[in-house]
Amino acid sequence: MFDLVIKNSRLVGKSGEYNIGVKDKKIREITKKSIKSENIIDIKSNYLMPGFIDPHVHFRDPGLTRKEDFRTGSEAAAHGGFATVIDMPNTLPKTNTYDALKEKMNLASKKSVVNFYLQAGHNSLDEMTRMMELNPVSFKVFMDLETDESLEEIFKNLGKLKDSTSYNGLVAAHCEKRSIVSEKTQELEESNDPIDYSYARPHISEDESVKQTIELARKNNLRLHICHLSSKNALNIARKNNISYEFTPHHLLLDNSAYNTYGTMVKTNPPLRPKDVCVKISDIDENSIIGTDHAPHTLEEKQKGVFTSSPGIPALETVASLLLTEVNKGNLSLELIPKILSKNAARVFELESKGEIAVGKDADFTVIDLKRKGKFDISTFKTKAEYSPFDGWEYEGAPVMTIVNGSVVFDDL
């Protein structure tokens, strides 16, 4: 007898309908035959996908919980079809000490309704060695906050950490060149035109930073994952060097003309790019990863000046439907959805029990109604953020149920 049976499931790439048997939070059977359980969910011929994984969220907890916390952030994740998230280390305090990492693990364990993993911030070699006792999935480096000299030291220490501990050598990098951003920002920081923010952090700063980061990673025998790629040239550099990367929905669907419509509501780092250099839906391939960079702020923080307002866009509750709409438009293959929203992130971040619907994997699932139509309404979102450039956009296709470790955490079936 199974703890849970999910019946009448369509699986991407397979014909017919399947029944999935779950026991002890694991997938134990995948069959077209009838199987028994006292707990049966009939998903009515909708698509069953491996639970979505977002490798890039900012849940602001601890220290910045006016913007978001692990409860509201994880509820937003579940609402958006995500069973697993990876949280970033730029909280208060920064998650770059053993004590801070331990504190965040404890509070997330109490608040989160989805699976969570944590990235750690860099520190001294001794402190990072202590942090490895808590198994962060990777270390995050904000290239735009560091000088070239400090970056050399940071990557050297990460290389030493890999040689002396269980650290797998994965570095997640925010790639913008500090010197270029500083120079261009000084030229434009008096501007009141939001579009100038994109020129203050030009695509060349990302392109050059990606090159530098690849060199530093290779020099120190580290694996590299590039966050929120926004420049087409930077994407080509990453692909040429076989480097993993992620796209955000806003960089794929908006260019910098959106600043004329939404103002600082679409301010983000890296910024939205001019149409001739930005990444697009057509750039998604079977190795791509979607990372939302879900980065909520208060309205007050978003409504300040062009250069004083806070950068960041909430995205967990819109991304799946935005991509499924592109599927329905014929701009994106349905077969790519479980790869870019689950399988590829599980591979890169070594979440070995996740990312696929297969016997022995964790019972994390996202149910997709490919024909569900609606209009985004920020007032119905779980996030604390009260803004989104996609508020009011119509969509076709939506996550209608999220299951985490065999338990339903969101149900709109």
Task: For each feature predicted by the language model, list its residue ranges.
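N-terminal metal-binding scaffold of metallo-dependent hydrolase/deaminase domains
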Residues: 1-35
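C-terminal cap of metal-dependent C-N hydrolases
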Residues: 359-413
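His/Asp/Glu-enriched, well-ordered alpha-helical/loop segment
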Residues: 194-221, 287-289, 295-368
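Divalent metal-coordination and catalytic microenvironments
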Residues: 9, 25, 45, 56, ...
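Histidine/acidic residue-rich metal-binding segments in metalloenzymes
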Residues: 126-290
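Active-site metal-binding motif and surrounding structural segment of the metallo-beta-lactamase
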Residues: 33-49
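Metal-associated gating/positioning segment near the N- to mid-region
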Residues: 46-111
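Divalent metal-binding segments
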Residues: 58-67, 86-98, 118-126, 142-149, ...
